[in-house]
């Protein structure tokens, strides 16, 4: 909890999110779940947490169960977001001001056995969210990823073709 409180109290322009609807996909994952907790700790943001694992969400977000600012819905990003509102009790056409896309099948086993399906799901999922956001007045979109997308490589600083990719190369 100390890290969550520390992040929530960071000197950021939080006022831009005050009263806004923020969608966090991958909310039952490590990064998405932490982002949900930081946003909820702020106390003035409407958080819509979306994930595939409803049981995990009930345990992880139990303290927010009766909080009117917290909403969880089961969602697989490979489906258009508009399908969710038609097939569930969620309000249709929620205007998400900000979308934080932290959902992906991060399982190495899934990528090893069905890499094309995993890649397609990531591409279509991102496209689905961007299209929904554009149609509903989204202000900003944040895509969360990992260095794993670059693969193992094998290059070093001394590789004849040039230096290896470093985190500092990307800011």
Sequence positions of predicted segments:
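Helix N-cap/beta-alpha junction loops of NAD(P)-dependent oxidoreductase domains
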Residues: 107-109, 152-153
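Conserved NAD(P)H cofactor-binding loop of Rossmann-fold oxidoreductase domains
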Residues: 103-106, 145-146
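Short alpha-helical oligomerization interface
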Residues: 108-125
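Conserved Rossmann-fold NAD(P)-dependent oxidoreductase catalytic core, especially the SDR/UDP-sugar
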Residues: 127-171
